UniProtKB/Swiss-Prot annotation:
Keywords: Collagen, Disulfide bond, Extracellular matrix, Secreted. The keyword Cell division does not apply. Residues 1014-1074 form the Fibrillar collagen NC1 domain. This is Collagen, type I, alpha 1a. GO terms for molecular function: extracellular matrix structural constituent. One of its GO terms (cellular component) is extracellular space. Belongs to the fibrillar collagen family. It is found in: Secreted, Extracellular space, Extracellular matrix.
Amino acid sequence: KSPAMPVPGPMGPMGPRSGPQGFPGEAGAAGAMGPRGPAGPPGKNGEDGESGKPGRGGERGPPGPQGARGFPGTPGLPGMKGHRGFSGLDGAKGDSGPAGPKGESGAPGENGTPGAMGPRGLPGERGRTGAAGAAGARGNDGAAGAAGPPGPTGPAGPPGFPGGPGAKGDAGAQGGRGPEGPAGARGEPGNPGPAGAAGPSGNPGTDGAAGPKGTPGAAGVAGAPGFPGPRGPSGPQGAAGAPGPKGNTGEVGAPGAKGEAGAKGEAGAPGVQGPPGPSGEEGKRGARGEPGAAGARGAPGERGGPGGRGFPGSDGPAGPKGATGERGAPGAVGPKGSTGESGRGMTGSPGSPGPDGKTGPAGPSGQDGRPGPPGPVGARGQPGVMGFPGPKGAAGEGGKPGERGVMGPTGAAGAPGKDGDVGAPGPSGPAGPAGERGEQGPAGAPGFQGLPGPQGALGETGKPGEQGVPGEAGATGPAGARGDRGAPGALGPAGARGSPGSAGNDGAKGDAGAPGAPGAQGPPGLQGMPGERGAAGLPGLRGDRGDQGAKGADGAPGKDGPRGLTGPLGLPGPAGATGDKGEPGPAGPVGPGGARGAPGERGESGPPGPAGFAGPPGADGQPGAKGEAGDNGAKGDAGPPGAAGPTGAPGPQGPVGNTGPKGARGAAGPPGATGFPGAAGRVGPPGPSGNPGPPGPAGGTGKEGPKGNRGETGPAGRPGELGAAGPPGPAGEKGSPGSEGATGSAGLPGPQGLAGQRGLVGLPGQRGERGFSGLPGPAGEPGKPGPSGPGGERGPPGPMGPPGLAGAPGEPGREGSPGSEGSAGRDGAAGPKGDRGESGPSGAPGAPGPPGAPGPVGPAGKNGDRGETGPAGPAGSAGPAGPRGPAGAPGLRGDKGESGEAGERGHRGFTGMQGPPGPSGSSGEQGPAGAAGPAGPRGPAGSAGSPGKDGMSGLPGPTGPPGPRGRSGEMGPAGPPGPPGPPGAPGAPGGGFDLGFLSQPQEKAPDPYRDRDLEVDSTLKSLSQQLEQLRSPDGTRFTYSVLEDGCTSHTGTWGKVGAPDQEFGLEVGPVCFL
């Protein structure tokens, strides 16, 4: 025997995806310090610093605005007597005196002119609600509304009875060419054609698209072993390995390079205020300072002395008429004085008033004298005693602004104001200059795993290996994907005609052919028995939205529906944007209602209210009277296609068809034999890192690094908050007076001063110039009552009073036509800002971000000496951001730090995106009906809204009362034959049925029944139009009723008609369906 050739066995199963965890690699060198992080948020404001020394007084500011009017000063001494003034205007009418004795009737006066229309009175208190008015007469019917938009498609109605087959329609017009049909079944191979002459060689064509992969040919003879294939593609990435064992202790690392300066620490808390220092020596006299800024507005000065008397002002415009004051109580009746003579001399200076005399007893009433003629106007009497202050008149128009007063002296410095709120953080200062390099920072935490690196360049092709030993046939591989279609080859010479091949396997089932012509109509089946009424079917699927129907004719206006119920509360609106801080809140809630007012007068009927919401549908009405016969309806749509008729006889053989298109590529043949294995693939990319192994023991301490370079000066910290005021230091010695400072800039106008105190008594004024006419004097004594004049003419009608209360609602008007859907309202104003919600629970930690691409290793810096901290430099202007430095080599893994303290609460997050609307809230309880407001005018009809979405099918309504009996229909065509029913069980003999057994296919039945076929057919024909197909309830048996006289019924027991293999017919007489 020849020695056995070692043949490679079949490919073994794939090894586990994940190998064991590798040993930890050596620690990498420490990475370079990362770039400086972004600036943190502004720190808290520092505490307030100590108060600065007071600045020098500014220049005197411009005079402040005129202060509020001071209290009246004490009256000055009487001035010298002025010139005699012009006669004053007549005094206002005095209060009515007590009724005097009745005078003689005077001569009637002339009719007065009608008075001007009085001002509109204030509205009276609201009266009690009057009794409901009588119902108004029913309004006229409204005009028919415009047709509403078509309603949504109604739910599908119950299936109608099957219609009879329609009449055959006319031949349709020739249709356009249909779309390309699906590829036909693969045609049989045609006979080979004769060989064509070889054509001239064409230009090389462009590469065609790759053709579909052909069916595999029969397995060829095994070829010689091929050369080793090219190197295979990288294998799939291996699964993550298990964690490796704990690594050995690493060697002591070399001293790391000095790190960059660390980020600046946060500003320290302000230190405790130190004790006050001792008083310093008296300083030298300082140089003259710059003028200080304008001081704070001073407090108002004391009230100045009264100024000299000004010139009398011109008369101001008359104020508006004041409201009528309450009527004063009548004074006591004084004794009647004697009539003085009319004086003509100058008015003497007033004497000092004498003491009040006691009131004398009332004298007896004298007889009525006749009224004398009116005497001349007497001299102006002494001013009367000041009366009680009248009620406050309406506010007069503002007087002209006074002239600007002289600036008051600067007031004393006010008390310091309250501490202001913490200001908003100021803008970030410019970045300081870069600091010197700081000490090396600690090693950073290990970075995230980097992304896989890019694929390396392909290596050079290896030399061909020696020919390998042929392997055993491998297992059948899966069918390859279909290749692209190749370019067509050149036409070869025709081969010799081959011998006929063996019959092929049956081809795949072809697509369904076009529907055949309808078969001839079969004989009508026999009428079945009526089945029980089936249960209601499930609601059908929602149909596609129908096309918009044509606009219907205007319907007659419907009757008024009752007012609908208040709708449920709407869904909550979207959250409004956060509003600005609101103004102070509105006035408090309205106080409790007052006592009920007197009833007002009945108001006029209000305008008709807007149309109410549509009421719920009314209950089913009584059945209407039988309508007249309608016109014949239009020809109905074609009914559903009838059941397929029996297959017709085959037609004559048709002519040979054209050769079909080339058949589709056949199904893939059996897989070919396995090829030789290809050369080993390239090494796949490394699998993902395994879980980190447990930390190794700590390495030995590295050598101390050389002293770092002096770090750069950190940026100046923010100013601390104002410290608490220190205790006052001891008083310093008084300094020598400074030289007079330069005049400061004009201060801001001071605030309006407070009202001054009451001034001192003024000196006697100089003699004034002659005054203008005096104001009307106080009221004179009441005159005697004059005779009553004749009644004046009726004045013009007063202005229209305020509208009365709304009358009782009238009967509801007829329901107007429905308005079209209004456009959507504008978004409501944002609601008030809600209380701040409690902090939500901490969110779950986010998934780690994708690893960044590893950067190239940066060069290690030289070790510098450690510098001392320099003084804070001035803030430089912000430099441009430098490019991001290269990432350093990874540092050693640090020990796990302890848990840090909870960080400060973060800033409030930005407002999130608007969430989806919440679920509908539960309907609130129905609130009490509000008081009916006055009806507004009827708005114009809105434009028609777009039709709403199709509504869900409503629940089936209650069964209506039976309608009137319809006309008997015409005889319909015969229906298709029904399937033969299953045999029933034998039954008891029934009454009233005339059962004939029609044995059409057999010759056993007696002839007389055959003559009645037509009779039965016509009876069944007339019934088939009016009955649904009758089916037995469970397919095996049915209950039948025997009808006797008229429509009384007798229900028999379960029974069957006919034997299992018999056909039977029924002669149905008058039928009552129960």
